[in-house]
Amino acid sequence: MKSRLLFLGPPGAGKGTQAARLCNANGMSHLSTGDLLRSEVAAGTALGQEAEAVMNRGELVSDALVLAIVESQLKGLSSGGWLLDGFPRTVPQADALEPLLDELKQPIEAVVLLELDDAVLIERLLARGRDDDNEAVIRNRLEVYREKTSPLISFYRDKGLLVSVEANGSVEEITQRITKVLS
């Protein structure tokens, strides 16, 4: 199974849930930029306060801030594979990530794109009840996602790394689909 992965998909597609399942089953490190940012916010750090204001508007945190967090996490890993969830989200972020991965001799092996309908996404996001999940913010996040991430999908498709997975259905069904495309 491939062990250096990126997960792409709109908010609510199940990236975090599926990443955790895949990592637990295969001894990989799950690097979720959303979780890392939320922990900075909870700790009340300067970076956390900056990130909180941006996230509350449904916008993306700066590339420099997220890349610094990701770099620190990747350099801190002892061994085994990893799964990046929530980064990169834009082509400039992907361009910034590549030299770091080259330096670490850990190139991406596959990019998993989780796809599903907006109605299901909105329903899932409202149901999970996070503070930054209200319908106006969710719709803005979906718009930002499409605007920023569509070119990234093409970027990884052109590199032959992209695999699409239908993210409707039960958690277990989606996990099985992902495992199948990565084997």
Curated annotation (Swiss-Prot):
Keywords associated with the record: ATP-binding, Cytoplasm, Kinase, Nucleotide biosynthesis, Nucleotide-binding, Transferase
Domain notes from UniProt: Consists of three domains, a large central CORE domain and two small peripheral domains, NMPbind and LID, which undergo movements during catalysis. The LID domain closes over the site of phosphoryl transfer upon ATP binding. Assembling and dissambling the active center during each catalytic cycle provides an effective means to prevent ATP hydrolysis.
Ranges where the record places region LID: 127-133
Entry's Gene Ontology molecular function annotations: adenylate kinase activity; ATP binding
Family: Belongs to the adenylate kinase family.
Function: Catalyzes the reversible transfer of the terminal phosphate group between ATP and AMP. Plays an important role in cellular energy homeostasis and in adenine nucleotide metabolism.
InterPro entries per the UniProt record, alphabetical: Adenylat/UMP-CMP_kin (IPR000850), Adenylat_kinase_CS (IPR033690), P-loop_NTPase (IPR027417)
Enzyme class: transferase
Organism: Parasynechococcus marenigrum (strain WH8102)
Residues given in the record as AMP binding sites: T33, R38, E59, L60, V61, G86, F87, P88, R89, Q93, R130, R141
EC number of this enzyme: 2.7.4.3
Catalytic activity: AMP + ATP = 2 ADP
GO cellular component, one term: cytoplasm
Protein name: Adenylate kinase
Positions of ATP binding: G12, A13, G14, K15, G16, T17, R128, G169
The protein's assembly and partners: Monomer.
HAMAP family assigned: Adenylate_kinase_Adk
Associated pathway: Purine metabolism; AMP biosynthesis via salvage pathway; AMP from ADP: step 1/1
NMP, as annotated region: 32-61
